[in-house]
């Protein structure tokens, strides 16, 4: 009986993937986000005429604007 319960517990953990963390691009590399970070962001700006600034990473909250794009799936902020 204990073996059956243990097997069911292991199967449940594997199926639910309790340790899942979002993966986002940050500085051109894929990073694993902290558990409370549910969004990837991609922010583009031009602080100077000939300089395009791109910021990418993980965020716990995200507001979408013209320059800031938000998404919630792995590697979606390229």
From Swiss-Prot:
UniProt keyword annotations, A-Z: Disulfide bond, Ion channel impairing toxin, Pharmaceutical, Proton-gated sodium channel impairing toxin, Secreted, Signal, Toxin
The UniProt record lists the keyword Signal: yes
Signal peptide residue numbers: 1-21
Compartment(s) of residence: Secreted
Disulphide-bonded residues: 24-40, 33-58, 62-70, 71-76
UniProt effect for mutating residue 48 to A: Important (34-fold) decrease in inhibitory potency of ASIC1a
Site (Important residue for inhibition of rat ASIC1a): 48-49, 54-55
Marked site: Key residue for inhibition of rat ASIC1a, probably binds to rat ASIC1a F-350: 53
Tissues expressed in: Expressed by the venom gland.
Effect of residue 49 to A: Important (19-fold) decrease in inhibitory potency of ASIC1a
GO cellular component, one term: extracellular region
Primary location: secreted
Keyword Disulfide bond attached: yes
One protein family per Pfam: Toxin_cobra-type
GO molecular function, one term: toxin activity
SUPFAM superfamilies: Snake toxin-like
Result for mutant: residue 29 to A: No change in inhibitory potency on cASIC1a
Domain of life from the UniProt record: Eukaryota
Family listed: Belongs to the three-finger toxin family. Short-chain subfamily. Mambalgin sub-subfamily.
Misc. comment: Negative results: has no effect on rat ASIC2a, rat ASIC3, rat ASIC1a-ASIC3 and rat ASIC1b-ASIC3 channels, as well as on TRPV1, P2RX2 (P2X2), HTR3A (5-HT3A), Nav1.8 (SCN10A), Cav3.2 (CACNA1H) and Kv1.2 (KCNA2) channels. Does not produce motor dysfunction, apathy, flaccid paralysis, convulsions or death upon central injections (intrathecal or intracerebroventricular) in mice.
Function: This three-finger toxin inhibits ASIC channels. It acts as a gating modifier toxin by decreasing the apparent proton sensitivity of activation and by slightly increasing the apparent proton sensitivity for inactivation. It binds more tightly to the closed state and to a much lesser extent the inactivated/desensitized state of ASIC1a isoform of ASIC1. It interacts directly with the outside surface of the thumb domain of chicken ASIC1a (ASIC1a), but does not insert into the acidic pocket as suggested for mambalgin-2.
Protein's recorded name: Mambalgin-1
Organism, as annotated: Dendroaspis polylepis polylepis (Black mamba)
């Amino acid at each position: 009986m204990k073996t059956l319960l243990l097997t069911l517990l292991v199967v449940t953990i594997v199926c639910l993937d309790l340790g899942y963390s979002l993966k986002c691009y940050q500085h051109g590399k894929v990073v694993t986000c902290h558990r409370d970070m549910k969004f990837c962001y991609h922010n583009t700006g031009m602080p100077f005429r000939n300089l395009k600034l791109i910021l990418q990473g993980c965020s716990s909250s995200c507001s979408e604007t013209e320059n800031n794009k938000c998404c919630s799936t792995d590697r979606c902020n390229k």
